């Protein structure tokens, strides 16, 4: 089996927009932890346009947040792709639809007086939308992430690191990585097949020097730590040639266009919904994190070598309408028994998930580059001993 996954640097136009959307979201949550927000950003040709819905749009300095985010990434001149100091900023922010707000605030169960419906009951809040999400975990890395996306993220992060630390001072913010691995008959990663790096750079640098520097300073340090067989690997660094014009001046950026980069690469399914710019009442956010949290606990309990968790919701309903798991034949107990144990131990109602993972905090800008999963700074990446013991006991 061959598996390929890609990542992008924080300066990629789409990732720039993800970070702007989530930086604004963090600012909104700082003012009101119960705020609702769905923030989209588009960037191109020296213009940044934010639009969407926010329950308290006047509470934050949106232009100030946008400029700071752009400058922190490293876009300080139009020559690099956009200048955070001088770019044009446009806002089209409205409040959330009352119909949607009512559906979230008063669930179908609440309106029909079903179940435990006390004033602070987790059943009172409904899902912010319909849809399905997928969570995944496996034994390929200590982080329980697929190895191809893990390597791709490390390469993209390393590109930004050597730029910001002036190790390769001629690099500019835009960049991408892609990794192809070969798997053995037991579906374990075995060989490094191909690495692709595209790095934006200043006009003055020689292309051969750039290729050598990136191979030695970025690629080899990351790859050498993997233990993969690299004897037949192909390394393609800036295979298109020079990459001087980059960032939003070369390609317009848009929030939510790197959803596979954000999750598990090509190793798992995706429900199609983006995460960035959305407050934790949105199922693309709370349910995606919950599905990952559950998947990690199943693997940590040694009930499967890998698992894909699917959760589906209806707008305005607190309880999921569907739940499924796929262990790709690696389960150590019967699937129906494992599924019952998960549903017994974990509470999938939106308010319960938000409470369990402490999601009403300004944590989201950090998720918007180098993946939402695989970093233990996030609550959904941490194994809860009580949940793990409960899961072990439930089977």
UniProtKB/Swiss-Prot annotation:
Cofactor: how and how many bound: Binds 2 divalent ions per subunit. Binds 1 potassium ion per subunit.
Entry superkingdom: Bacteria
Residues reported in the UniProt entry to bind ATP: 12, 174-176, 242-243, 251, 257-258, 274, 278
Residues spanning the membrane: none
Subcellular location: Cytoplasm
InterPro entries in the cross-refs: ADOMET_SYNTHASE_CS, S-AdoMet_synt_C, S-AdoMet_synt_central, S-AdoMet_synt_N, S-AdoMet_synthetase, S-AdoMet_synthetase_sfam
Pathway assigned in UniProt: Amino-acid biosynthesis; S-adenosyl-L-methionine biosynthesis; S-adenosyl-L-methionine from L-methionine: step 1/1
Record's catalysed reaction(s): L-methionine + ATP + H2O = S-adenosyl-L-methionine + phosphate + diphosphate
Alphabetical list of Gene3D superfamilies matching this protein: 3.30.300.10
Entry protein name: S-adenosylmethionine synthase
Annotated source species: Tropheryma whipplei (strain Twist) (Whipple's bacillus)
């Amino acid at each position: 089996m061959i598996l390929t996954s890609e990542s992008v640097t924080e300066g990629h136009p789409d990732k720039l927009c993800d970070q702007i959307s989530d930086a604004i979201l963090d600012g909104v949550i700082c003012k009101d932890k119960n705020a609702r927000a769905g923030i989209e950003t588009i960037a191109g040709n020296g213009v940044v346009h934010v639009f969407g819905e926010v329950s308290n749009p006047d509470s934050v300095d949106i232009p100030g947040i946008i400029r700071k985010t752009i400058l922190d990434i490293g876009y300080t001149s139009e020559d690099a792709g956009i200048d955070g100091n001088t770019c044009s900023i446009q806002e089209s922010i409205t409040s959330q639809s009352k119909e949607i707000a009512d559906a979230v605030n008063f669930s179908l169960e609440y309106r029909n007086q079903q179940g435990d419906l006390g004033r602070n009951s987790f059943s009172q809040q409904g899902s912010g939308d319909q849809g399905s999400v997928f969570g995944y975990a496996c034994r390929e890395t200590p982080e329980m992430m697929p190895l191809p996306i893990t390597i791709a993220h490390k390469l993209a992060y390393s590109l930004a690191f050597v730029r910001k630390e002036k190790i390769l001072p001629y690099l500019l913010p835009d960049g991408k990585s892609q990794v192809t691995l070969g798997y053995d008959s037991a579906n374990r990663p075995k060989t490094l097949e191909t690495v692709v790096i595209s790095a934006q750079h200043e006009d003055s640098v020689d292309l051969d020097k750039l290729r050598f520097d990136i191979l030695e300073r970025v690629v080899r340090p990351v790859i050498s730590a993997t233990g993969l067989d690299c004897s037949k690997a192909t390394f393609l660094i800036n295979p298109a040639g020079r990459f001087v014009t980059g960032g939003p001046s070369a390609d317009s950026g848009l929030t939510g266009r790197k959803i596979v980069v954000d999750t598990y690469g090509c190793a798992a399914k995706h429900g199609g919904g983006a995460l960035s710019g959305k407050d934790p009442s949105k199922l693309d956010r709370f349910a995606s994190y919950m599905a990952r949290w559950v998947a990690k606990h199943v693997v940590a309990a040694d009930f499967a070598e890998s698992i894909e968790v699917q959760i589906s919701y209806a707008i305005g309903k607190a309880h999921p309408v569907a739940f499924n798991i796929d262990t790709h034949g690696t389960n150590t107990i019967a699937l129906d028994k494992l599924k019952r144990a998960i549903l017994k131990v974990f509470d999938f109602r939106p308010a319960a998930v938000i409470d369990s993972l402490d999601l009403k905090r300004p944590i989201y800008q950090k998720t918007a580059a180098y993946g939402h999963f695989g970093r233990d700074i996030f609550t959904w990446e941490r194994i809860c001993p009580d949940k793990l013991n409960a899961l072990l006991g439930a089977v």
